[in-house]
Amino acid sequence: MIKHNELVIGGVRTSSFPFKIIIKESRSFELSESKTQLLEHDGINGAILQSNSHRPSIKKVFTMQMINPSEDELNQFMALLVREKFWLESERLKTTKWWCYKIEATEAVEEASGLFIAKITFICHPTKFFKDTDTQTLTGNGVLRVQGSALAFPKITVVGQSASETSFTIGDQVIKLEKL
């Protein structure tokens, strides 16, 4: 019903429900803290830095207002929130989406007659992903451009014929093919 600021939770749009769902959130760009640790010891001045560039999961919190849902409709919406391993998209962010592991337990509380409010926390991978697919065509030996710093597992299709060795590079890694 309401498309402004809607969320897409595992392919299901909040606007697809027969009652109004208003998403309250400020547009934000999160970056979780690195797992690097400062180790302090009483016998030395300062600290030892134990580097770890990996990042923990992030929490995306949304407050949702549901207006005049029936009990069955509210149960259908709440059933959506038990999903695990799904994509989360926001209408406000046009180019990125998040891979979510799960949703923390939540409840919908009736604040006024017919107005239910739920605070929902999505536990997501710390890297945002692009919504669009990046298609690149290489001729001869070429370099596959990477976007961002996330681990990526691209689908690579090699077409053609070659009597000699062909190679291409992804980031710093060189992939060699004997014959096509």
Predicted segments with their positions:
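Short polybasic amphipathic segments
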Residues: I2-G10, F86-L88, E165-F168
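"Short basic amphipathic alpha-helical interaction patches in structured regions
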Residues: L74-L81, I117-A118, T135-T137
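Intrinsically disordered, low-complexity segments enriched in serine, threonine, and glycine
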Residues: F130-L180
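Short beta-strand and beta-hairpin "edge-sheet" elements
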Residues: I23-K24, E30, W87-K131
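Short, acidic/charged, Gly/Pro-enriched secondary-structure junctions
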Residues: V8, T63-T106
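Polar/acidic, low-complexity leader/linker segments enriched in S/T/G and N/D
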Residues: M1-L39
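Oligomerization/assembly interface segments of phage tail-like spikes and tubes
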Residues: L39-P69, G114-T127
